Amino acid sequence: HNEITKDTGIIRLVFVGSDGEPVELHRRKINKGDPWLIASNSNEEVEKWAHSFFQRAIREERDAYLGLKDTVIPGYDGVMRETVENIYQSHYKAEFEKVGLKYHYELIDAQAARIVANPPQRALWGVPENTTGRKLYKLVRALKEFGIPDRRHSVSISRMSAGGGDQYGSFNMPVEEDGIIKVLLDGKEKHARDVKKGDPIIFMANQREAIKDWVSQVFRDAAKNDKEIYFGLKREYMEYDDVFSTGINEVRQILVDDNFQPPSFMIMRPSSQLKKMITDPPRSGIYPSLNLDGDI
């Protein structure tokens, strides 16, 4: 669940367990117009996915590569990594060794780089985090169809700094028992969901003013270096990303009013941004990305 804050106030993440008493897990000030997001994952579903992942690797005789970002979000990706690796150790390690297969874990950005620059001969890429998994799936499909072009091109990445929020400023942890997670803004409930013991949760937000400052830097850098801009946003069903789109238009108008000619830009889905950067790059392009997308 994600939305744009309608009022400035204190936003709180609260857990209600079996005793019915609300326990505050996290709080922060949030300003009107700032985006926030709450997500959780089912540990049971991760376990099912892990069995399917390792069984397929054995069936197709492929080394298994798991990719997550447990260094940045240990209470979310780290929990999923632990779950998957427990399944591997308990059920599949001996069989992997028997048939000569290997299991590897690496950070998701390193995995993305390996897929493009140094892929093994036979590999099964495992990404239990759904959003990133879709991006890499679409990238692999595009690489199979188009490959990497030979033409000369210049690619720059403009990654939003970690201080801006998103995953790098997130609160993340596994819940200790079955219960309900709630998001409250100045005491008013904004969202609630059921969770089970061990399920990882993540709460993150960003600052509207930090977003606009970053967008302004992107425009000025692109103009200085004569680059086209390709933003990657999921604005059609993510209010969280839509605030970036609004910020882009606001900053562009401010620059125009200031007699500054903004460079040409496009807004596309993050998966399309990734595919274009690698399989169909322009002569000179800059690719602004949110924190974790920027890493990838």
Task: Give, region by region, the residue ranges found by the protein language model.
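Flexible glycine-/small-residue-enriched beta->alpha junction loops
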Residues: H1-D34, R152-D199
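Residue-identity detector for glycine
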Residues: G9, G17-G20, G33, G67, ...
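A broadly tuned "polar low-complexity/structure-edge" signature
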Residues: F53, I108, V155, G169-M173, ...
